[in-house]
UniProtKB/Swiss-Prot annotation:
Positions annotated to bind S-adenosyl-L-methionine: G104, L123, S124, A125, M126, T127, L128
Organism domain of life: Bacteria
EC number: 2.1.1.177
Gene that specifies this protein: rlmH
Organism of origin: Chromobacterium violaceum (strain ATCC 12472 / DSM 30191 / JCM 1249 / CCUG 213 / NBRC 12614 / NCIMB 9131 / NCTC 9757 / MK)
Subcellular location as annotated: Cytoplasm
Enzyme category, top tier: transferase
PANTHER family: METHYLTRANSFERASE (PTHR33603), RIBOSOMAL RNA LARGE SUBUNIT METHYLTRANSFERASE H (PTHR33603:SF1)
Annotated protein name in UniProt: Ribosomal RNA large subunit methyltransferase H
Major subcellular location class: cytoplasm
Description of how the protein assembles with itself and partners: Homodimer.
Length: 156
């Protein structure tokens, strides 16, 4: 199974890339975690937040593989525990196909993309820095994977 994190934004600090890579390489052969960065729309010069979100929406849609399960990260999404994420991961693995997690840009995501999501999920009700979200999401996906594999990484 392939899990992709689509994240609007490029040029993260080195610590973000290093932390993400640390979690991404921990998976076994049955799961691959991949990060795809989506170029953010430049703001200013007549480009409103709405126009920026629309342009980023088109880039995100183009990057989502057909038939992939879509999980959109949003601070108003469902508040799952790590165990609930593991249950979701187990269900997605059994159903076959790939999973795409989407992290929006500075101005958020389009309503259309949120409506298209199979799951609207939050890491926190608070707004978080995008680099931190990449790392936290990769960690939680790995934690869910470790729960399913009875690995001692996760403790209740």
């Amino acid at each position: 199974m392939k899990i992709t994190i689509l994240a609007v934004g490029t040029k993260m600090p080195r610590w973000v890339d290093e932390a993400y890579t640390d979690y991404a390489k921990r998976f076994g052969r049955d799961i691959t975690l991949e990060l795809k960065e989506i170029k953010p729309e430049k703001r200013g010069g007549g480009v409103t937040a709405e126009k920026g979100i629309a342009a980023e929406h088109e880039r995100l849609i183009a990057a989502i593989p057909p038939r992939a399960r879509l999980v959109v990260m949003d601070e108003r999404g469902k508040n799952w525990t790590s165990v609930k994420l593991a249950e979701g991961l187990k269900e997605w693995m059994a159903g076959g196909g790939d999973v795409v997690f989407v992290i929006g840009g500075a101005d958020g995501l389009s309503a259309e993309l949120k409506q298209r999501a199979d799951v609207l999920l939050q890491l926190s009700a608070m707004t978080l820095p995008h680099g931190m979200v990449r790392v936290m999401l990769a960690e939680q996906i790995y934690r869910a994977y470790s729960i399913l594999n009875n690995h001692p990484y996760h403790r209740e």
